[in-house]
Amino acid sequence: MKRKLLVLLALGLVMAFSTSALAADVKFSGNFYAAGMYQDKTYSIKDYGNSTAFYYQRLRVRAEFAVSPSLSLITRFDVMERAWGAPRIDPDNFSTFIGDVDSAGSISENENIAFDWAYIRYASPIGVFTVGYQEDLAWGTKFADWSRPAGKIAWAYNFGGVTLMADVAKLLELSSTAKLQTPWTDADIDKYSVAAKYTWKGGEAGMQVFYLRNAATRGIADFKSEIYGVIPYAIAKFGPITVEAEVDYYWGNLADDDTTGYKLKMDSLGIYIDALADLGMFYAGGTFAYLAGDKNLIDDINNAGTVTMMAGGKDWMPCLIMFNFDRTYWAGTIDAPIPDFGIMYNAWFYQGRVGVRPIPALDLGASLSYAHADKELFPGMKKDYGWELDVTANYKITNNLSYMLGVGYLWTGKYWRGDETDLDVQDNYLVINKLTLTF
């Protein structure tokens, strides 16, 4: 009899714990888009390259499991991120090794299903702690942001309008593990940062300071990188006008060779300013951005940084063709002696834009942009990236469903031909239409 009671008690405990777990609140949100793109040229040099046209889609789902008011598990995953009918990428693609550019999964996994986030959020009396794979490499405005998941431990504490933050992130690990046997020790990329932000009714301002240590290549070439950065920003609203600005300043050793003692220093600056006047039916705005180029290609100071360490980032996409990461991700690099990877680098950028909302559901916009290089990559080369005119129409079909049609035309500059000055460039244009569902 006692044994039966113990069995019943054990079953009761299992049921109790199971019921508690099943009672956790689950909240889902996300978006789905399906789009079609036509790009007239895949090469910037005259008489080279062809056109391309295709459809593509992605489903992104965020799920939050609320275990208690102060404790939750948060996940995010992407499903069927692929071009319709296109060949699937080789599962052994290099992204299997380092992950897709904006995902914790590989390109092959994203074509099926890839989890990007899985982390615990605990709101304690001394601050909010988050532990696990979560968003990183994004701060302030969208300028120079890369929004990529990383394994991270983060802390944030809010009092009044002030938020204090600190985190440590593992961006890459090449030390020996069960999945990858290597002879290297301490071969990884780590990032440490502290930040503070103040929020008020009309805006916010903050500053982040970080230290990035890249020792991933020490087993191949005996050097490492140690980069420091400071990123102040502000976003403020003055009546109908919204202004945002950000400064990115990086310094340190881009390459520090342990064997020879050689050091390549980094000293680079980026500036971003944007203003938008929203007058109800009409709006107008402008953008200025600057990213330093290298003053002297043969000295021991790099003023331009790297494409990932001092660039416009993938989140900031001011045009449909020029400096647009999404276009590059789906249609690929626009080839030339200097390829266009869709990321602003070594450039001055200027844009003016206007728009009208004839009815609440319809937004018609147009922008004119111009960019030129800050410094020459080769003696005597031209600096102009080109002029671009973009026209877009966004129509809100329902509260959760919208349709966008955009046309961009690029008067290609001669920068892309590099030092091959005998080549002629060719203009390019793009047409995109996109259906987006949010939930």
Sequence positions of predicted segments:
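A conserved mid-domain beta-alpha-beta active-site/ligand-binding segment of alpha/beta enzyme cores
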Residues: Q208-L212
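Beta-barrel outer-membrane channel/assembly domains of diderm bacteria
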Residues: R3-Y133, I153-G160, L164-A166, T199-G203, ...
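Flexible glycine-rich, low-complexity coil/linker segments exposed to the extracellular/periplasmic environment
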Residues: D299-M344
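Short glycine/acidic-rich loop motifs that flank beta-strands on beta-rich extracellular proteins
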Residues: A216-G219
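Short, catalytically relevant binding-site loops at active-site mouths
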Residues: R213-N214, Y250-G252, Y290-D294, A371-A373
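Long, well-ordered mid-to-C-terminal structural blocks that present hydrophobic/aromatic surfaces
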Residues: K263-G313
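Internal, well-ordered domain-core segments that constitute the primary functional module
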Residues: V128-W200, E204-G206
